[in-house]
């Protein structure tokens, strides 16, 4: 039995989204129990109204909620009994294999890092997410917004934890291909930080394939793509915006005249397949990667379907136990990175 902790009060709409999303998820997974944290009276009423299977839900009463615009410092200092904090505590205490929250990203990252700590050798956690491609291939992208300013060493650490996670989840595919997001594929391009990161990764034991431009990510050119949080977040929001634009443009075009409406009827199966493939809700649920525990961040503005998919992500991560398998591999890869850094420094001193 898999047990997931759910911050029921987090997100833009709170219980209106988390409860129906959790109910649909439980109906699809009889092997799951949920610990839902939040106001017990409100939670029980919402769960009963949704027809949730109460025999597989434990309610953990909390008295506080972290606001969507609340600072991480305030959440850490003043919201120790928040639904977010208590959900993460369930993972720390071994009562749940993963926690899911649609709450304030900064507060969630700060709280999770404080409660769970990071994997030894990893300075900062990163927001990581699996992105679709034009095939059945998926690519893990990180960092998507947690750390807007990174050192080369931190970017290299992101590459390590991303590579180790993908390898743990798909060992049959061999060593994951790691790409560094840049403005061009040539190693002379990019900021000084990116150039130094390139050299570190080039001399590491990772399967580093070099720089990758953002327009190649959705074509499955790499299994792991690494960027700082500023670049990664802009990249992610651009992809999401492009998908929404394309979906809307196709819909408007087919509705523009009678002939196109008739054509839409004939193309309906293909359109449904395309809509299903591009539905951003299916890829809701980002991993706070680098922590000693599984925490999944749902988009704060998602609907019940999107929240269900965030729970699906937590379920698959917990069931695969991928994160529990990576610490040894991370330690070995970080040791190789230190060697690469030492060689790089020696070469620089010799110039």
UniProtKB/Swiss-Prot annotation:
InterPro entries: FA_synthesis, Phospholipid_synth_PlsX-like
Function comment: Catalyzes the reversible formation of acyl-phosphate (acyl-PO(4)) from acyl-[acyl-carrier-protein] (acyl-ACP). This enzyme utilizes acyl-ACP as fatty acyl donor, but not acyl-CoA.
Entry EC number(s): 2.3.1.274
The entry's keywords: Cytoplasm, Lipid biosynthesis, Lipid metabolism, Phospholipid biosynthesis, Phospholipid metabolism, Transferase
EC class of the enzyme, as a word: transferase
Subunit annotation: Homodimer. Probably interacts with PlsY.
GO MF term list: phosphate:acyl-[acyl carrier protein] acyltransferase activity
Family indicated by similarity: Belongs to the PlsX family.
GO cellular component terms listed in the entry, alphabetical order: cytoplasm
Organism: Neisseria meningitidis serogroup C / serotype 2a (strain ATCC 700532 / DSM 15464 / FAM18)
Principal place of residence: cytoplasm
Reaction(s) catalysed by this chain's protein: a fatty acyl-[ACP] + phosphate = an acyl phosphate + holo-[ACP]
Compartment annotation: Cytoplasm
PANTHER family for this protein: FATTY ACID/PHOSPHOLIPID SYNTHESIS PROTEIN PLSX (PTHR30100), PHOSPHATE ACYLTRANSFERASE (PTHR30100:SF1)
Single GO biological process annotation from the record: phospholipid biosynthetic process
Name of the protein this chain belongs to: Phosphate acyltransferase
Pathway(s) served: Lipid metabolism; phospholipid metabolism
């Amino acid at each position: 039995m898999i047990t997931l902790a759910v911050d029921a009060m987090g997100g833009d709409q709170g219980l209106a989204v988390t409860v129906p999303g959790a109910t649909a998820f439980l109906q699809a997974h009889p092997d799951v129990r949920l610990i839902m944290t939040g106001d017990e009276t409100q939670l029980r009423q919402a769960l009963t109204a949704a027809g949730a299977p109460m025999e597989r839900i434990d309610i953990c009463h909390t008295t506080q909620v972290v606001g969507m615009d609340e600072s991480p410092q305030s959440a850490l200092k003043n919201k120790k009994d928040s639904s977010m904090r208590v959900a993460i505590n369930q993972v720390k205490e071994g009562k749940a294999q993963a926690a899911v929250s649609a709450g304030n990203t900064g507060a969630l990252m700060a709280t999770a890092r404080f409660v769970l700590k990071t994997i030894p050798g990893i300075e900062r956690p990163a927001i990581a997410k699996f992105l679709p491609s034009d095939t059945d291939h998926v690519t893990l992208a990180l960092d998507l917004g947690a750390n807007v300013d990174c050192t080369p060493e931190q970017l290299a650490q992101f590459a390590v934890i991303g590579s180790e996670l993908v390898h743990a989840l798909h060992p049959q595919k061999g060593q994951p291909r790691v790409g560094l997001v840049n403005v061009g594929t040539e190693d002379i391009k990019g900021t000084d930080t990116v150039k130094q990161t390139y050299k570190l990764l080039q001399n590491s034991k990772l399967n580093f394939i070099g720089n990758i431009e953002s327009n190649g990510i959705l074509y499955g050119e790499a299994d792991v793509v690494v960027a700082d949080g500023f670049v990664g977040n802009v990249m992610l929001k651009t992809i999401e915006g492009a998908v929404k634009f394309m979906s809307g443009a196709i819909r408007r075009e087919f509705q523009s005249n009678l002939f196109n409406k008739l054509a839409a009827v004939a193309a309906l199966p293909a359109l449904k397949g395309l809509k299903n493939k591009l539905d951003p809700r299916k890829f809701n649920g980002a991993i706070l990667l680098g922590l000693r525990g599984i925490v999944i961040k749902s988009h704060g503005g998602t609907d019940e379907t999107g929240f269900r998919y965030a729970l699906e992500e937590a379920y698959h991560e917990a069931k695969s136990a991928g994160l529990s398998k990576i610490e040894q591999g991370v330690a070995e890869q970080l040791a190789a990175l230190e060697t690469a850094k030492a060689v790089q420094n020696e070469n620089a001193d010799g110039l």
